[in-house]
């Protein structure tokens, strides 16, 4: 006679998990903590939180959001004699401007070309000057500049003339925002001397408004001395913005 308490294959009781086994599975499935005690995604030692690396860093805007026109005028290879021999590098000449009457030039040296250009660009941004423009397209009056053996002549031009300039001088006027000008350079073809002479001539530019304030007169009075009628002088004086 079979024992009534014996269990057959079909009458096996359900197995129950021991508390130790349940805790072991939960512990094995839990994420590992960082070295500092925090989780992988947070906590003090986490990758994205606490003292971890910040990913929301923004680059500094050195120009205050202003868009500048950058012109690479000249680049040449230079060498420096040191105790162990010669050390070669590159020198760059860059002109920058906002196209609205401000421009500057800079010179930079480095072992690599991109670094030399970046140095020259940074120097040009720090040396920008304001040049008054007539109608926002040409110079108010003629001017001359001199540096080294170079002499440059700048002349204002009527609308539609364009930029009559070559080489380094064209880059200056394009970045400055001048649309009509006639220039001439004699004495040198060195781009450094030409650029410096050009900026010397631009630095001497004055507007009728500044001259009138310095003399204590009206702008129309200065224009009438050029032979213009009263009505034409007043209309031209009203059009002067700087």
UniProtKB/Swiss-Prot annotation:
Q: What is known of its domains?
A: The N-terminal domain interacts with the head of the 30S subunit; the C-terminal domain interacts with the body and contacts protein S4. The interaction surface between S4 and S5 is involved in control of translational fidelity.
Q: What is this protein called?
A: Small ribosomal subunit protein uS5
* PANTHER family xref list: MITOCHONDRIAL RIBOSOMAL PROTEIN S5
Under Gene Ontology molecular function, one entry of this record is:
structural constituent of ribosome
Quick check: keyword Repeat in the entry? Answer: no
Q: Where is the composition biased (Basic and acidic residues)?
A: 41-65, 218-234
Question: Can the keyword Nucleotide-binding be found in this entry's annotation?
Answer: no
GO BP, sorted A to Z: translation
Family, per entry: Belongs to the universal ribosomal protein uS5 family.
- Subunit annotation: Part of the 30S ribosomal subunit. Contacts proteins S4 and S8.
Q: Which UniProt keywords apply?
A: Ribonucleoprotein, Ribosomal protein, RNA-binding, rRNA-binding
Q: One Gene Ontology cellular component annotation? A: small ribosomal subunit
Q: Which residues does the annotated region (Disordered) include? A: 1-65, 204-242
Q: What does this protein do?
A: With S4 and S12 plays an important role in translational accuracy.
Species of the source: Sphingopyxis alaskensis (strain DSM 13593 / LMG 18877 / RB2256)
In this chain, composition skew of type Polar residues spans 1-14
Domain S5 DRBM: from-to ranges:
68-131
């Amino acid at each position: 006679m079979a024992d009534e308490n014996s269990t057959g294959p079909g009458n096996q009781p359900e197995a129950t998990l021991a508390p130790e086994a349940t805790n072991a599975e939960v512990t094995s499935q839990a994420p590992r903590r960082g070295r500092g005690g925090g989780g992988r995604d947070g906590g003090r030692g986490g990758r994205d939180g606490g003292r971890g690396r910040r990913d929301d860093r923004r680059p500094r805007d050195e120009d205050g959001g202003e868009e500048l026109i950058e012109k690479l005028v000249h680049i040449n290879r230079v060498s420096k004699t040191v105790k162990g021999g010669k050390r070669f590098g590159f020198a760059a000449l860059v002109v920058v401007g906002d196209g609205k009457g401000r421009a500057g030039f800079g010179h930079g040296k480095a072992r690599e070309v991109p670094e030399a250009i970046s140095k020259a660009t940074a120097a040009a941004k720090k040396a920008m000057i304001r040049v008054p423009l007539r109608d926002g397209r040409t110079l108010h009056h003629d001017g001359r500049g001199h540096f080294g053996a170079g002499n440059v002549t700048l002349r204002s031009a009527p609308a539609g003339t364009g930029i009559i300039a070559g080489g380094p001088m064209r880059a200056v006027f394009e970045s400055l925002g001048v649309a009509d000008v006639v220039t001439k350079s004699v004495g040198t073809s060195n781009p450094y001397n030409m650029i410096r002479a050009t900026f010397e001539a631009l630095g001497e530019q004055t507007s009728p408004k500044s001259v009138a304030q310095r003399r204590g007169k009206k702008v129309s009075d200065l224009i009438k001395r050029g032979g213009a009628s009263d009505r034409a002088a007043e209309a031209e004086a009203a059009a002067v913005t700087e």
